[in-house]
Regions:
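Short, polar/charged alpha-helical segment
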Residues: 43-67, 197-205
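Beta-alpha junction/loop-to-helix N-cap segments that form part of ligand/metal-binding clefts
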Residues: 30, 45-52, 64-139, 152, ...
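The feature captures the short pre-catalytic strand/loop hairpin that immediately precedes
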Residues: 142, 300-320
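Gram-negative bacterial Sec-dependent N-terminal signal peptides
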Residues: 1-27
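Immediate post-signal peptide segment of exported/extracytoplasmic ligand-binding proteins
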Residues: 23-35, 63-71, 168-181
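Extracytoplasmic "Venus flytrap"
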Residues: 30-55, 77-84, 106-107, 185-194, ...
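Segments of small-molecule ligand-sensing domains
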Residues: 311-324, 335-404
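Extracytoplasmic ligand/sensor domains, especially the bilobed periplasmic-binding protein
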Residues: 99-211, 262-287, 293
Length: 430
């Protein structure tokens, strides 16, 4: 072999060796995700456990090898439920150091960002379940296209439809006659208002008499006046559109006023912490659960949830409310979509979006019996139309630690019914 050939062979070997050595390093390039949370604003009561669920999940993912060997850099930012702060943060996440995807929070900010997400091709798995975020193409005609928006669980609108379907049957089962009366309650804000029209439409369809909506703020306060209005209206079923924090104030005020009504909470409207705070006033509230079980439930996937929880509670003794587990499920759906993207062209926003369409009746690995199966398609981002209804049961004083109250049955979640809604085209995006 000539000297020239030897040198060429050596050079090729060095090049191949260099590429071989570089490959693992390239595979380890961190994957950036944004995580918008409310730890300090008016929805922090439910935002804190949900956000902790997301943070713990990615800490656990990184501890167990990351995504295809790559670490996830989760940038968690508390925006205090302020839309301008959310938009300012989004500009950073869509800038030079662009994130592959975002785990979002509120309705007002998520809807404000929908067009930007589509333009910048950044998927957003939000904690807003506004139906307007579920129509990727705009074909439903009720909302603007939201091709990069996803959420885990039934939409606010579908949850109301499920609860009112149950309420109509409940009215008959109790032997009541005449039209039951329904009222929408909540702040005059995009989040509580999101399912208002859809709820009132199906209520009318089901034979309810619609009452004038009752407005109360997103923050705790004295809502005695609202409860007196509710009492005098003769309402039989009342939808609580706010988060648990302000709902507690309403429940307590209405109990004091002697209001006899069946409260229907939205998905953020009730949890174990709220039941402890409200005590007997929370007894009987019906609300939807996004997961198949609550904390400590009998399911194979609960072992995974318990391990994830230890990332911020090494002792494993903290009771996690329903919102924490929903945060875990949302984070793991995102993780698997990112994982698919990394294996199919790279973890870009476009590929992550495609990752959400790869499975039908999808439950994240290791979460069997915990996360309800979800299916997203390019034409329909309603991941599920199943609405699992539970009743909050409170017996006796609630001064003891939450763990003890749950163990002793002082607070418990009682399954009421599962409503499987039809996938109606005219409900898409509404």
């Amino acid at each position: 072999m000539t000297m020239k050939a030897l040198l060429s062979t050596a050079a090729l070997a060095v090049t191949l060796g260099g590429l071989s050595a570089a490959t693992p390093a390239m595979a380890q390039t961190p994957i950036a995700l944004g995580n918008l949370v409310d730890y300090s604003g008016p929805t922090n009561d439910v935002g804190t456990p949900y956000g902790q669920g997301v943070v713990d999940t990615y800490a656990w993912i990184n501890k167990n090898g990351g995504v295809n060997g790559a670490k996830v850099n989760l940038d968690t930012v508390d925006y205090g439920y302020q839309v301008p702060r959310a938009i300012a943060q989004y500009k950073k996440w869509s800038g030079a150091d662009k994130v592959a995807a975002i785990l979002g929070w509120g309705t007002a900010d998520t809807e404000a960002l929908t067009g930007f997400l589509a333009e910048d091709k950044i998927p957003d798995v939000s904690a807003s379940y506004a139906a307007a975020l579920s129509d990727p193409t705009g074909a439903g005609g009720k909302a603007k296209p939201a091709p990069y928006n996803f959420f885990y669980g039934p939409s606010y609108s579908d949850a109301v439809r499920g609860m009112l379907t149950w309420a109509a049957d409940d009215w008959k089962a109790k032997g009541k006659t005449g039209k039951p009366k329904f009222v929408h309650m909540g702040a005059n804000h995009p989040y509580p208002n999101a399912p208002k029209a859809a709820g009132e439409a199906i209520a009318a369809e089901l034979g309810f008499e619609l009452l004038t909506p009752i407005v109360f703020a997103l923050t705790p306060g004295d809502y005695s006046a609202q409860c007196l209005t509710l009492k005098s209206s003769g309402a039989n079923y009342a939808y609580l559109g706010n988060t648990a924090g302000s709902n507690i104030s309403v429940l307590n005020a209405c109990k004091a006023a002697g209001v006899d009504v069946q409260f229907l909470g939205n998905v953020w409207g009730m949890d174990e912490n709220a039941a402890k705070a409200a005590g007997a006033a929370a007894d009987g509230v019906v609300f939807p659960l996004r997961t198949a079980v609550a904390w400590g439930g009998n399911a194979p996937g609960m072992k995974t949830v318990m391990e994830i929880s230890k990332m911020s509670d090494p002792s494993g003794t903290t009771y996690r409310p329903v919102h924490y587990i929903a945060g875990v499920c949302s984070a793991l759906y995102m993780k698997e979509a990112v994982e698919w993207a990394a294996k199919n062209g790279g973890a870009t926003g476009e590929n992550v979006k495609k990752g959400f369409y790869q499975k039908a009746n999808w439950v994240p690995a290791g979460m069997e019996g915990v996360c309800n199966a979800s299916t997203w398609t390019e034409k329909d981002h309603r991941g599920t139309l199943k609405v699992d209804l539970y009743r909050m049961k409170v017996a006796g004083a609630t001064d003891a630690p939450l763990n003890d109250l749950i163990k002793n049955g002082g607070i418990k979640l009682e399954k009421v019914k599962t409503i499987d809604l039809p996938r109606k085209a005219d409900w898409l995006g509404w």
